[in-house]
Regions:
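Short, structured motif recognition centered on aromatic/hydrophobic residues
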Residues: 5-7, 54, 64-69, 113
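Ligand-binding pocket scaffold of soluble enzyme catalytic domains
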Residues: 31, 61, 76
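Core segments of cupin and vicinal oxygen chelate
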Residues: 2, 9-49, 84
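Intrinsic, low-complexity N-terminal interaction/targeting segments
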Residues: 41, 55-56
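Short, charged/polar, Gly/Pro-enriched secondary-structure boundary elements
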Residues: 48-53, 109-113
Length: 120
């Protein structure tokens, strides 16, 4: 795998305001779904190209941010490799029921990046 960007996620302080803005700015299809963890996740379908999602920012006081995800073949190995290269693991490998696995790293410069392994 060439490790493409496969998903982008908006963690926002105001989901309704963000949905209103982006649905008017772009021709995105927004679809709410309930996560197994009890929060609403809005899927963003863009037609061709990389889609994404949005959810309520869960870190108190944190600003709204866009978080890109890169596809990997082995999420455990990629997360460990990132750590060995100086990254901080913000969220260790976690299963997203029915979809795949993710981890979130902070690179040595302070930039956040998600790693994603889809279920086959």
């Amino acid at each position: 795998m060439a490790n493409p960007f496969v998903h982008v996620e908006l963690n926002t302080t105001d989901v309704n305001k963000a949905k209103n803005f982006y649905s008017k700015l772009f021709t995105w299809k927004l679809e709410d779904m309930q996560s197994e963890m009890g929060f609403t996740y809005t899927m963003i379908s863009v037609g061709e190209g990389t889609g994404g999602g949005m959810l309520k920012q869960m870190m108190p006081g944190a600003p709204s941010i866009w978080l890109p995800y890169v596809g990997v073949d082995d999420i455990e190995a990629a997360t460990k490799k990132a750590k060995s290269l100086g990254a901080t693991i913000m969220k260790d490998v976690t299963e997203v029921a029915g979809f795949g696995w993710l981890s979130i790293i902070v690179d040595p410069t302070g930039a956040h990046l998600g790693l994603w392994k889809p279920k086959k």
